[in-house]
């Protein structure tokens, strides 16, 4: 590979540094410019909420689908099933989680969608502001009171006609093997009677993941995003049964995508 190609490491570092810097700069400008809007629209909370959602969705869509690919950080080679599931709003989207880019990429595709985040993120000043003015829900899965309060807030978001995005693994995976699912999203689906839409987000190389070399990955990183058929809760299901059905479906979808990549691992029993 030539010195101007993907394999020239200084060039790779430069491209990714520009990408990271532009993200943090744009996010800071967005938040700073948003403050006057929040103040001006305080008497009109519904208008404020809608405007912020539209602007943030447009920003994330441009950043993840146009700007970062233009820098050569990755290519999105496949997005399937999105048009079929968008009319189902409100719905609960559950996605596998391997890198920090997962959430903003999906939020750039899904308008009017809240997201569940860890409580430790919610304590950070920036996230605290986002939680107040956007549909971010902070939860501590180890605290019953936090889970109960978060379930209630999620139900309000869904009853308002908005989607919810959840990463049921809870944290970024260290391999291609799906981690055990937390039951929060599936308990919520049972209570609200709403479909669960499994989402696969797959990259040929790790990017901002819990793997060495993922900060400056070298090579042609191809992203595939698949929105699978909705899984509807039934009266016979409990949250565990619903979780298991979704887990198996996602694991089957990931297995051929992972084959021959760094994510390729021996499948757990639940693949079968």
Name every feature range the model reports, one short phrase each:
Residues 79, 137-140, 233:
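Short acidic-hydrophobic, aromatic-tinged amphipathic segments that line or gate anion-handling sites
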Residues 64-68, 106, 131, 189, ...:
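Structural element of the ATP-grasp superfamily
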